Every structure is written in structure tokens, then in C-alpha cells.
């Protein structure tokens, strides 16, 4: 920035909070307002004074039983035209406030540890990040899905609403991109905990971390730039209205303003931890710090503080103390520093820091280009010469430390050495000490308290009444340490043309000529296009096609390859033949227990030869007595686990296909339906792994499984189950090419959102509407475009 350009100066200081200000966000109403949250357990709304500068506390809200860590604004709706305020706390809860009540409208419970980050999207969706290593997606007062994948606390979350994408940043040093509940990409590059995220555009975002760096990313994965300037943990980042420039705050007591990719201005504050910041619509910057004061900085002359207020701020800043051991000012050797005459020389850049010696004191000054002078930013404490004798350091394993403690964990046991510098975080040191010596993590509080008690008066950032670390202010967080598919031809996916083809003829139903699922690709609806004949689907869809002669022939052929202990006898083969005859002939007779025992024996054949037995199971499971036998509460878990194991992406495509079709057919009876619902999360998470292959039959089976779950959820309105199905639908639509699979996914989608406004909003938030628009122009088969247009009318 040129020296003549406008500089940010203090506009006002806002006392009110009694402890650290941990979060800030611009508010929708009144215009120009913002919301703050604090460790004092309160949330406060600040409205601008008119016409120029200053803010007044308009509303104070309470609801958390512990520190409040983060805040965001939920956009306006018909019911709440001024939007809602969401806050997350150390009590594991999220409180939702309106502007007309000091108490929460409702509280979201579900996280198992501190909620430390929030972001809102369209249609009432909310994304939360927690120390419990998860992020959760909420719609109104319900949890829609949980994002699992990080190995440490999720410190930062952001929603990119236009694409239905979500970002999470973690103490495991990574950032993850999520779509429809699934991790699509992991960004690696930061060398320490990721603390903040900010959106630049639909394709780019920024991140900041404890490694004192800021990174600019494309959502495709490329890191476009790394920015350095801070000398300690960076806690927050906020973007200007131009969506290009940004501001950051950090543990180095500074607010930094970045323009055109460079640090254009550094503003020091009289507090150690500058926890949070936000940029108002008029370009003013609001910051919150560990001293409980909110400060606003502006470029506008009409909103700049009076000369007396600026002098008072500079006086407060000059009286602050800076510990030399934080490293914020570089290596300091007091004996080699110049005297006050050095301040007669002008600085070379905005924010340049200069240290001078005044008798026994070391003072820190910062150059202000706009004022053309050096401004004192504090007295440096703890500065000394550079040798061990003058510094009072203790050598341990070749390194210098302020302290080396002997820790006795067990009486009579060995003692452990614990090296510590006063610039270190006591909780992190305690954590690393326990990890290094393989000690029980339950000792964390005890060891950290030992460090704090024995370094009182010298440990950075600690008050007299609480144990606070620069990660959280709460003193309890333990940060993590560094941390094939084969193409299958339609004619015969398994054994060759003209041979046994399990289920290759596709779908049959008892209502041929009426149900659009039963027609081939030339199907046309006889009804008017204004009449919806596609969804909601009321009954499960099954795979019925069979050729018993070919199935038995293949079974007998492969029986010779089975291990001796698993070979079927001639009597066994006769029993299986009777099952097939009974099932395919629609006889009223029930399969016997002996027949079902032989079938169980057959489906436990080795994976290379088991597929004909699975095909018999696929057909048999539709029979009520067979369904009850395999899907009852006693046998169901073992049965489903066996089939789920066959869904291994590295397994045989024939087994994958027939296992999926068997699961689809389980839905026809009450016992099977109950089992499928109880196994939903495990089954769907394994089944979705098969989406990446090119086998269209597997895609159709996967779509049918999702459709059958949708039928169940349409009946009982399980919003969590609907969320998982919507996620699966969105994920499969990204890769599927077969139009029959696409059609079934569309019917599943329509069934899920029919008569359910919450499901409609969730589908919108996932970007499903934009995802399916391309199918509205499909000409063959017509059922695809007709179904798609009906869904778009709902969305």
C-alpha cells in the first residue's frame, strides 16, 4: 500500500464483557450491528450509534452453562425476518436466539465436547465443529448428519451454499471438503492446527493456522499462495466486502490487514490474545481480545476516535508488557540494543518494529506511516544476554529451558524429566510429556496444573483465577499430534455370453405395464404429464427375474470346487432345488428348516464360487418364512454382517451385485424391513463405496436400495434417515451414467421430499436441485425427464 493511502485507526473501544471475547459476527439487524460472545457466558448485540461512530449494547443473551466459544447468524426467514443468532459453547451445546428474548428459542444437543465453530447456509442449515472431532449439519432443530473423518478437534467450519459444499479445518492440520455428507477432498499443507477459514468466492477460500501462516486454496485442491507476517498462532480470519482483501488476528497481540496479498498494516493491541475479528459492511474492523474489550478500527475520518481517545489507547498500549520469550519480537540481546536516539530515524515500512534500550528497560516501538512517528507498543520483559549464564537457562538433552522438572507419577517408581519454557503452552507441554513417556492421559490436568503452579508470574497468557491456554481459553483441550472395479458386460456380467446370468434380465414387478419401473427404455406414461405417477413410491422394489435351471446348473458345477467340508451332498442339492421350485412356482408350501440350513451352508462358500447360492438367497428372501428365518432379531445381525462383507470394493462384482439385490428384496416383509432399518448406517456406508465402479447393474441395485429406504422413511418421517438417503442420492448422481439407475434415484429423491418441508430444505442446501436440472432435458427414456421436472417443481 502506498504511504499516502488511508490507514486504519481506532474508532471506539467497547467494554462490557467480563472475560475474553471469543467470537464476533456481523448482524442482519439492525444494519451495521454485530454480535459478540465471551468466556463470561454471554452473547451481546451491539447496534451502531448514529450518525457516525460508536456502538451501544442493545441486547444481552444468556443460555450457556459454560464459556461461549463461537457465533454465527442464521439468515432471515418468513418466521424470523431478522434472522437468528447461533452460539456454541464449552457446555457442548448450540443455543439459538431471536432478537426479542434474552433466553434461547431452543438448544441443539448432540456434540460430545466443546462446540468451537459455526457457519450457516441456506434454508436454515447450520454447520458446527467441535472438539469431539466431528462436524454436524443441522436443519432447524434437528441434526441431519454427522461429518466424521478428522482425528482431532474441528476448529473451523464454513459452508459454500451455492455448490452445497462444506469445509472443515482441524487440529489434525488438515482441511476437508464435504459434499452431501461425504469427504470429497483433503487439503494438506499447514504444519499446525487449522484455526480459521474464510470464503473468497465459489472456488477459493483462505485458511489460517497455529503455524502462523495463511493459505489461499482452490476448492479443487491447489494451494495458490502462502502468506506470512504473524509471529504466533493465528486465531481468526475475515474477508472484506470486496472478497479479495482480508484481516487476521493472532496470539502476537496484533491485528493485521492484508491487501493485494501483502500485509498492508499491523495494529498492536494491549492484550496478549486477539481471538477474533469481523469486517462490517462499511469496511470497519471489529476485534475481540483476551482483555474482554471489543475494539473497532476504521479508515473513515468521520468514524475515527478523538485525539484524546487515541492518546489514551496509545498510552494503554505503551504500558503493556511484552515477554521476550514469546518470540514475537525476534531474538533479543539487551546489551546490543541502541538507545533512544535510534527513534530519530524514520521507519521503512508500516508496522515495522524497533527495540531500544532506555537504562535497564527495553521498549518496543512500531512505525506508523500515516503519523510519521514511532508509537510505543510496550515494555519488553525477560530480555537478557544470549548466553546460559545471563539467561538463567537449564540445559537438557542439548537444549536450553527455563525449567526442567522431575515428575514422580507413581510412588516408588521412576521420575520423569519435564523441560519447560515460559513461552510454551502448559497444556501442550503436559500432553506431549504424557505421550512421550507413555503415561495415562488422565494425568493431563494434574501435570498442567503442576506446571502452572510452579511457574506462576511467568507463564504467558494465564490469569489468576483460571487456567487458560491460547488454543481455547478453557484449559481443557488436548490438541492432536501430527497427525477396483471391473467393467461388466450387460449380456453376462459374470460367466460369459449364453451362460448363467444372475438377475441379468433386470426388474420385474407384478404390475407390468403400469409401474414405470417395469417398462424398458421405451416406456411412455399414458397419463397427463401434470399427473405424478412416479412418487411417492409406496412399496419396496424387488429383483425377481430368475432362471432356476441355469442357477442350479452353475451351483452343481461349482460344488466340485468347494472345500471338502463345505461341499453339498446330493441330498443337499435336492433340497436347494426344492427351495427354488417352491419360490419360483409361487407354491403355498413353506421351505423347511433343513432346506434353510443347507442354503446358509451354501452362501458361506468361498467368495470365488458363492454367487449362485447368493442368487438362490436373493429369490428366497422374498418368501415370508425365509425372510423371518434370516432377518429375525436373533439371526439378523449375523446374516446382514455376512452380506455386508461381500460389499467390499475389492471383492467380486457378482457377489456385490447379488448382495445388494438380496438387501433390496429383504424389504418385502416386516422382519426384513426392521433389520434393514437397524442396519441402515452400516449398510449404506458400505454400499456407497461401490459407486465408483462402472458396473451399471451395481448402480441400479444401489439406486434401488436407496429407493427402498426412501419408501420406509416416507412412512415414518425419520429426518436423520432421510438426510443419509439424500446424501447417498447426491453422491451417486455425481458418478452414475445409466439412466435406469438415475431414474430410480430421482424416484427416491421425490419420495423423500414429498410432503416434508424439512427434507425439501435439506435437499436444497445440498445443492440437489442444481445437480438434477440436466435430467429435465433427457428425451429417452421420457420417464427420467418427467420425474425430474416434477421434483424441480417441489424444489
Curated annotation (Swiss-Prot):
What is the protein's major site of localization? nucleus
Mind naming one GO cellular-component term on file for this protein? synapse
CDD domains the record matches: WD40 (cd00200)
Entry keywords, A to Z: Acetylation, Cytoplasm, Developmental protein, Neurogenesis, Nucleus, Phosphoprotein, Repeat, Synapse, WD repeat
According to the entry, every stretch annotated as the PFU domain falls at: 366-465
Location(s) in or outside the cell: Nucleus; Cytoplasm; Synapse
Q: Which InterPro entries match?
A: ARM-like (IPR011989), PFU (IPR015155), PFU_sf (IPR038122), PUL_dom (IPR013535), WD40/YVTN_repeat-like_dom_sf (IPR015943), WD40_repeat_dom_sf (IPR036322), WD40_rpt (IPR001680)
**Subunit annotation:** Interacts with ubiquitin. Interacts with UBXN6, VCP and YOD1; may form a complex involved in macroautophagy.
Entry-linked PANTHER family = PHOSPHOLIPASE A-2-ACTIVATING PROTEIN (PTHR19849:SF0)
Q: What is known of its domains?
A: The PUL domain is composed of 6 armadillo-like repeats and mediates the interaction with VCP C-terminus. The PFU domain mediates interaction with ubiquitin.
Q: What is this protein called?
A: Phospholipase A-2-activating protein
* Organism field: Rattus norvegicus
Q: Which gene encodes it?
A: Plaa
Amino acid at each position: 500500500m502506498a504511504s499516502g493511502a488511508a490507514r486504519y485507526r481506532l474508532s471506539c473501544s467497547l467494554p462490557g464483557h467480563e472475560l475474553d471475547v471469543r467470537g464476533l459476527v456481523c448482524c442482519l439487524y439492525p444494519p451495521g450491528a454485530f454480535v459478540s460472545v465471551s468466556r463470561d457466558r454471554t452473547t451481546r448485540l451491539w447496534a451502531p450509534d448514529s450518525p457516525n461512530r460508536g456502538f451501544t449494547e442493545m441486547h444481552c443473551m444468556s443460555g450457556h452453562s459454560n464459556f461461549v466459544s463461537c457465533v454465527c447468524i442464521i439468515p432471515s426467514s418468513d418466521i424470523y425476518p431478522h434472522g437468528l443468532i447461533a452460539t456454541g459453547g464449552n457446555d457442548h451445546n448450540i443455543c439459538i436466539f431471536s432478537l426479542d428474548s434474552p433466553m434461547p428459542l431452543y438448544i441443539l444437543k448432540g456434540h460430545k465436547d466443546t462446540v468451537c465453530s459455526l457457519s450457516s447456509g441456506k434454508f436454515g442449515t447450520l454447520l458446527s465443529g467441535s472438539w469431539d472431532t466431528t462436524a454436524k449439519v443441522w436443519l432447524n432443530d434437528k441434526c441431519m448428519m454427522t461429518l466424521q473423518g478428522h482425528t482431532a478437534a474441528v476448529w473451523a467450519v464454513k459452508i459454500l451454499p451455492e455448490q452445497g459444499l462444506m469445509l472443515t479445518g482441524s487440529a489434525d492440520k488438515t482441511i476437508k471438503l464435504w459434499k452431501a455428507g461425504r469427504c470429497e477432498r483433503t487439503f494438506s499443507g499447514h504444519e499446525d492446527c487449522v484455526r480459521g477459514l474464510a470464503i473468497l468466492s465459489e472456488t477459493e477460500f483462505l485458511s489460517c493456522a497455529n503455524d502462523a501462516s495463511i493459505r489461499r486454496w482452490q476448492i479443487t485442491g491447489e494451494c495458490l499462495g502462502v502468506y506470512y507476517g504473524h509471529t504466533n498462532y493465528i486465531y481468526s480470519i475475515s474477508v472484506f466486502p470486496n472478497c479479495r482483501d482480508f484481516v487476521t488476528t493472532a496470539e502476537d497481540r496484533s491485528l493485521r490487514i492484508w491487501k493485494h496479498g501483502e500485509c498492508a498494516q499491523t495494529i498492536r493491541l494491549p492484550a496478549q490474545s486477539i481471538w477474533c475479528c469481523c469486517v462490517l459492511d462499511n469496511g470497519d474492523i471489529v476485534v475481540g481480545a483476551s482483555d474482554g474489550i471489543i475494539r473497532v478500527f476504521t479508515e473513515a475520518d468521520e468514524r475515527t476516535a478523538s485525539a484524546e481517545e487515541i492518546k489514551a489507547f496509545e498510552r494503554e498500549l505503551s504500558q503493556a508488557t511484552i515477554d521476550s520469550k514469546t518470540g514475537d519480537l525476534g531474538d533479543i540481546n539487551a546489551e546490543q540494543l541502541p538507545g533512544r536516539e535510534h527513534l530519530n530515524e524514520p521507519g521503512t515500512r508500516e508496522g515495522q518494529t524497533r527495540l531500544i534500550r532506555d537504562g535497564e528497560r527495553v521498549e518496543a516501538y512500531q512505525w506508523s506511516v500515516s503519523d510519521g512517528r514511532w508509537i510505543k507498543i510496550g515494555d519488553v520483559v525477560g530480555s537478557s544476554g544470549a548466553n546460559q549464564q545471563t539467561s538463567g537457562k537449564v540445559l537438557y538433552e542439548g537444549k536450553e529451558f527455563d525449567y526442567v522438572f522431575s515428575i514422580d507419577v507413581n510412588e516408588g517408581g521412576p521420575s520423569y524429566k519435564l523441560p519447560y519454557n515460559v513461552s510454551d503452552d502448559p497444556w501442550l507441554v503436559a500432553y506431549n510429556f504424557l505421550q512421550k513417556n507413555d503415561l495415562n492421559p488422565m494425568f493431563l490436568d494434574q501435570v498442567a496444573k503442576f506446571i502452572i503452579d510452579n511457574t506462576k508470574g511467568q507463564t504467558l497468557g494465564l490469569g489468576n483465577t483460571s487456567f487458560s491456554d491460547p488454543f481455547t481459553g478453557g484449559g481443557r483441550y488436548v490438541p492432536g499430534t501430527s497427525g477396483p472395479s471391473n467393467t461388466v458386460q450387460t449380456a453376462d456380467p459374470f460367466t460369459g455370453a449364453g451362460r448363467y446370468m444372475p438377475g441379468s434380465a433386470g426388474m420385474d414387478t407384478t404390475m407390468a405395464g403400469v409401474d414405470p419401473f417395469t417398462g424398458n427404455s421405451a416406456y411412455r406414461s399414458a397419463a397427463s404429464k401434470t399427473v405424478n405417477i412416479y412418487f411417492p413410491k409406496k412399496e419396496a422394489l424387488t429383483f425377481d427375474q430368475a432362471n432356476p435351471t441355469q442357477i442350479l446348473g452353475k451351483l452343481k458345477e461349482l460344488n466340485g470346487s468347494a472345500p471338502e467340508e463345505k461341499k453339498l451332498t446330493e441330498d443337499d442339492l435336492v433340497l436347494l432345488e426344492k427351495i427354488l421350485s417352491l419360490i419360483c412356482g409361487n407354491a403355498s408350501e413353506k421351505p423347511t428348516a433343513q432346506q434353510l440350513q443347507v442354503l446358509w451352508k451354501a452362501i458361506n462358500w468361498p467368495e470365488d464360487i458363492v454367487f449362485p447360492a447368493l442368487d438362490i438367497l436373493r429369490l428366497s428372501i422374498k418368501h415370508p418364512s425365509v425372510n423371518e428365518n434370516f432377518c429375525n432379531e436373533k439371526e439378523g445381525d449375523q446374516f446382514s454382517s455376512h452380506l455386508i462383507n461381500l460389499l467390499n470394493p475389492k471383492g467380486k462384482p457378482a457377489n456385490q451385485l447379488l448382495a445388494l439385490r438380496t438387501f433390496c428384496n429383504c424389504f418385502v416383509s416386516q422382519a426384513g424391513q426392521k433389520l434393514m432399518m437397524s442396519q441402515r448406517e452400516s449398510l449404506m456406508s458400505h454400499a456407497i463405496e461401490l459407486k465408483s465402479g462402472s458396473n451399471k447393474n451395481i448402480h441400479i441395485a444401489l439406486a434401488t436400495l436407496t429407493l427402498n429406504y426412501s419408501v420406509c422413511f416416507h412412512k415414518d418421517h425419520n429426518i436423520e434417515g432421510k438426510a443419509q438417503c439424500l446424501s447417498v442420492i447426491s453422491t451417486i448422481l455425481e458418478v452414475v451414467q445409466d439412466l435406469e439407475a438415475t431414474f430410480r434415484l430421482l424416484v427416491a429423491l421425490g419420495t423423500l421430499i414429498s410432503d416434508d418441508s424439512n427434507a425439501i430444505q435439506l435437499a436444497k442446501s445440498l445443492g440437489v436441485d442444481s445437480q438434477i436440472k440436466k435430467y429435465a432435458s433427457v428425451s429417452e427414456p421420457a420417464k427420467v425427464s418427467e420425474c425430474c421436472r416434477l421434483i424441480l417443481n417441489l424444489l
